[in-house]
Amino acid sequence: MPSPRAPEPSDAPEAAEPTDVHGSSESAGSRTTPSTPSTPPAPPAAPETPRERAHRLLRHPVTIATAAAALLHVLWFFFFANTGGDIAAQDAWAEFVGRHPGSAYNLAWYGGMHPVSYSVVSPYLMSVLGVRTTMMIVGTVSSGLTALILVRVPAVRNPLACALAGVFAFLCNALSGRVTFGLGMMFAVGAVAAVFCWPYRWRYKRWAKAAVAAPLAALATASSPVAGLFLGVVAAALFLHKRRPGAYAIGLAPVAVVGLSAWLFPFSGTQPMSLGTLALPVLFSVLVFVLVPRDWSTVRTAAAVYGVGTLLTYVVDSQIGSNITRMAMLFAGVALLAALPYAVPRSRRWYALVLAFAGLNFWIGFKSVDDIVRTAPAASWNRELAPLVNQLQQVGAERGRVEVVPASSHRESSALAPYVQLARGWNRQADMERNPLFYDDTLDPLSYREWLDRWAVHYVVLPKDRPDNGAVQEAELIEQGQPYLREIWGDQNWKLYRVLDPVPLADPPATVERAGAGGVTITVKSPGRVLIRIPYTRWLALVDEDGKVVQRPQETEESKLRSKDDETAPKTYVNTHGCLNKVEEGPYGDEWTELLAPRPGVYRLTAPYQFEPGTPCPEELS
């Protein structure tokens, strides 16, 4: 019985060497055939011709899986890729960083969000390559890397079939539109391949293996924190089996990336997870643990860690939530199919494996089709948006926020973000954190008016498209008619409402001239403190008309001399260009931005990346 445990790099065969099912390998030059005195040695095999070598490579599982994945992702691009669902969010982020590549804060959604809180890498890569092109590339490469791992692990007796199961799983990921997660998984599978497919002749160069695996693990987490969580499961399984070098190589970098990004670009929110969502990933983690051979210790431990982690995710609210199901959707089928040759045909275990594998693929296939149907945007979003945009521009909607009742496709999050600041967007964690009334059954005419005032909403758009689950009550409330909403325009696709007596985005003595995704321009009529209803971040800065960050308040020379004589003496600052404070307001504890304006004039707020973020006021001026 071959060992089904994935080999350590020191056990793994060299890529150019043949590997038997026991995981041992011998070079062609050292392999000999025992002979009897009466039997002469066999003649040496004829060298492989280029045609034979090409034929062998074309039939290799990695080649077949990669080619199949490439073809299927091209078909996805032409026939199934749309502009709704997760694709809408990724389109919005890619367009934002394309228009504002140096901005650390996107003001088009939820008052303000850091691009890094979504992904460090994917918005910029998608902006360059295109969202759908990125999906085709990462799905194809991930399928090829998965096939490589399956070929190199001696325990896998049916690598081609398992590789094709992986191709189907990555195709379903594309059908659901998860480009950012797919990008992270490409790097994650690459990191795992570096650990498990390390060449035999380099088996003692563990530092080199770590130098390859760790950056890939960091890129995986920087692309998608959920992909980093997958690496955490693999690292935990390796660590528990005392395979520490591999565990450290792929497990430490994700922790560092998550910690650093959370410190520099804080974000909080909760991704919901229902009991129905919990059931299937836990079920398949149990099936993998029970049905694979008992000596597949690493696989079984990973399944157990994943199952426990899924239960904890359900019990403890977090930003992961239902996203944790994606790991089972990608790899449970591969593990179950790899275990099939170890079961006696037509035994109970064999039938259980077949049924589990079929059930897994039915689940991910049905979920993908459901995602396509549910998130397909109405044609009006692509063909008849211009009249709505024209009306928003005519009424000056760019001076406040606009609430577009979220459609099931969430197409509004990308279609209108370039033109106005949206009160909402497409990030479930942020929506539940900042707008809980849409989820906790507290929405009524009074609370809705309070919410409109809280976020300085000046206009409300009601699409005729089917609303999102978190917007059904809102759409019904608006349709009923509210005294503080006045319909000012409509056609067969949209209704536009003006909010009567809206709360301004910036309090007097300031007026907002323009509020866009990349910044806000306000005119201050007299010096003083101005409350601006933008969630505070350390990256917000004041810039001049050329976009250059203005000088921060400077300590006076007299104050510096006083501090030399007495460290406890109060400091004095000259605030020449203005500075920004964080202030709390309202019953929700909102942390808004306050401008300390030293003189009348025009002030511009943006959030450029810089070593000393923002234009904060010193404590003495706060």
For each feature predicted by the language model, list its residue ranges.
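Start-transfer (signal-anchor) and selected internal transmembrane alpha helices
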Residues: 1-13, 19, 28-75, 621-622
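Transmembrane catalytic cores of multi-pass membrane glycosyltransferases
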Residues: 74, 81-90, 100-103, 110, ...
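Active-site lumenal/periplasmic loops and adjacent helix-entry segments of GT-C-fold
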Residues: 74-161, 165-185, 189, 225
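Membrane-interface junctions at the ends of membrane-embedded or membrane-associated helices
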Residues: 109, 196-209, 240-248, 336-352
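Alpha-helical transmembrane segments of multi-pass membrane proteins
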Residues: 140, 182-193, 284-286, 331-337
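Specific aromatic-rich, kink-prone transmembrane helix
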Residues: 145, 167-171, 183-203, 209, ...
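Internal/C-terminal transmembrane anchor helices
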Residues: 347-371
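Extracytoplasmic
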Residues: 368-622
